[in-house]
Amino acid sequence: VSLIRKRSAGQNTLKTHVISVMGSCGERDRGKRPMMGEIVDKHTDLMILTNEDPYGEDPWQIINEVAKGIKHKIENENFWKIMDRREAIRKALALARPGDVVIVTGKGAEENMMVGNEKIPWNDKRVILEELSTSDSRD
């Protein structure tokens, strides 16, 4: 919330772009999903919707419910739906230019992603560092 406030206050002078990677957890707060999409839509320049702990829900359904709140972006132009979370992070990092801010939300310091009843090893920080390292070697 504080980042959003700072972003709104400096909207005219801020020369950076804010790029978000976000999802929504399955099996809870379905009614909040479009609201989450709307908030991120209003306060970021580019956004990527992705998978985040779907539990037993269809992850595409979750992504599409979040997308219902997006009114100011055009799919595949400044907003994307990418199921694979690593691919979503990779896309965000590829879009970023010097001075831009990439925000990856949802998983925080969690070490697993819940898919059905299965815990899949996952750590956003590790994946981000791996992708940055890989992109540095490609440049």
Language-model segments: residues:
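ATP-dependent carboxylate-amine ligase
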Residues: 1-139
